[in-house]
Amino acid sequence: MKGQEMSLELGLIGNGKIAALIDSRAEVVWCCMPRFDADPVFCSLLAGADRDLAGGFSVSLVDASSFEQSYLPNTPIIVTRVSNDRGDEIEITDFCPRFERSGKLYAPPILARQVKRTTGNPLVQVSLRVSEDYGCSHREAVVHKHAVDFPGKYPLTLKSSGQPLSMDVPHPVTASHTMSFVFGGRDAVADAPPFEQLLEETLAYWHVWSAALKLPGDFVDAVTRAAITLELNAYPETGGIIAAITTSIPEAPNTGRNWDYRYCWPRDAYFVVNALGRLGDVRTSARYLHFLLRVAEAGGSSLLVPMYSVDGGPIPEEQTADCLAGFRGMGPVRIGNKASVQAQNDIYGEAILTAEPLFRARRGEEVGEDPVSARAGDRTLFTRLEQFGEHAARLYDQPDAGLWELRGTTRVHTFSSMMCWAACDRLASYAEAVGLAERARYWSERAIAMHEVISKRCWNPKKKAFTAAMEGESLDASLLLIPRLRFVPATDERFVQTVDAIERELKHGDFIYRYVEQDDFGHPENAFLVCTFWYIEALAAIGGTRRAEALALFNRVLAARNKHGLLAEDLDTRTLEQWGNYPQTYCMSGIIDCALTLAGQAIV
């Protein structure tokens, strides 16, 4: 809308194949088709002051003055109620279809919208601008009576039901009819069932999915919303899990810290499948692990890279989309991510820890359709994971860019070293679980030797803390994960002292910064939100009076979510405004982990 500054007060709809962001006035401001990392068809989110010229899909009530928006409970279906001062009111329902159809998951690349009259005699105007080439051009529209075609490399269609469709012309919406729209790939739209069936079956699907979650006694709504959001970032065709559906929303204003997160990071995915696994969803772990093993073995060397496209292929070389001004005009808008070519040694640990829910599951229990071996952890899966363990044992004391993906320097990061240790430690437990005593001894001996080196070289006796790197002086927030990795227990004096040091150096108000030292882009300005969730987990694990602190802080952090219960990557600690790519799976995983930990469930 002209004159309205873009914010992250946005709702998310999706189905795992695509996703879209909808603003408070029911305009679709971001959507890529036919998959998460494709060219955006709607991109006014990143168009700056030119958002009215960028791609978007709006359904507007003439003379609208009031807007109310919320999710239907336990679903990713958004309802927006719009009214004006004359007493006219409409209800707009937005979703992406997802349900079982002919024994398979039906999640087509389409958006579904419906407009209903609730009171008065509303006039509604539909506006659809389809972007191409990252905002450099628009698709030409070919208008038919009940459809609009948008030819191109990936042909798109808008199909309407009800009265004949005229774009940008006010339509009356009467009590006797509704306006329904299905927009997306031409073939997908042609194959779609009637709108009411799409809505009813999608609603039923998510009610069943949500009911299967093993929820804590408290924070039920927050955890359910977080779990649904994570599931929307899991690509069902391959099992890949993206970090966020957006690119280039700045971590802080005018910093240039604008990154493309529409890809699959083994690190981020570990946190996602771990959180969902704690809620009882083991299938997502199995599908993702199959994805990871497939991409590793496809290269012939079992080496992993920091990120993949949703189909398991390489991501594009980083470039800028110069036709888009950026979020609030704060470019650049990036496509691809240079961090994909970095050394990030922790990824082998995360790959192995991802399998932990499978080895905890009952032997022989079906956990997925893909041949991982499609069963809970067994000897075949264990043997395939050992290749990652060998890389971890080789790399644990080697320099890398670390989990913060520093672009200008490498060092032996403590988190990477400990994650490599965790890889060997877990392989020992997996081997024991499947009755391979010799392999259990092998991996246990490697883990013990690594633990001794890391304990000596990553502990700074003068600082009385584990440090960010071997023989280092500085801190970073990943050290809060030490008990989760089981390197030392939360009650170990070294960890307690490390938390004390982090509070002194990295805590600003309620929030934890990932680090405070200068990097390639200067000093970090906003808090990286997941670090605060790690801090809450650490306090809860330490116990005693710190547990009450953790609970109080968790409630305050939850209050920083937007009205939809969603969080971006970063937060301005003074204004509590969200920044960074949105919604971010790291943060939504953090909500689940903290709620379960505070409910007494062990960190896994």
Segments and roles (model prediction):
Residues 1-604:
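Acidic, mature catalytic/reactive cores of soluble proteins
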